[in-house]
């Protein structure tokens, strides 16, 4: 039975894996350049990063590597993690009162060395946010370090008026697709 290596230090991804009864044998922090390429579409961006992260982690012959990447997009514009509070404020202003996409790429490299990748898109619509709501959310610090500047599993859930697709995708790892990929390479599921 292969051992699972999670190519992510995200506590949210570990929590999500635990929901499907999966506990990584090892955690590794992949080192790759996450800068979007000029003109790169959000779907292509997350697929490239997920594959790059999975392949960047050293793997023993009996190990399977799982990596993921999530981003938020408004149209073709990719919203990465906010650099600072003004950037977070700008992102929340862009998301206010509109629909956006949350894209995740998930990649599993099996014991055969083959990379298997899936892309998942969830549509989220935020209510119109007041300046006071944006100020309070920025002050909470919750949006820092999160793609698109918000955590749907936290205070920002109250901003969501519509969601179409995978909720776990918005948290950071689409569980349906992840479960299928892990099963396809022999990782036992709970």
From Swiss-Prot:
Coiled-coil region list: none
Gene3D superfamilies: 3.90.950.10
Entry EC no(s): 3.6.1.9
CDD domains, alphabetized: Maf
Disulfide bridges in this chain: none
Similarity remark: Belongs to the Maf family. YhdE subfamily.
Function in brief: Nucleoside triphosphate pyrophosphatase that hydrolyzes dTTP and UTP. May have a dual role in cell division arrest and in preventing the incorporation of modified nucleotides into cellular nucleic acids.
Stated name of the protein: dTTP/UTP pyrophosphatase
Upper taxonomic lineage: Bacteria, Pseudomonadati, Pseudomonadota, Alphaproteobacteria, Sphingomonadales
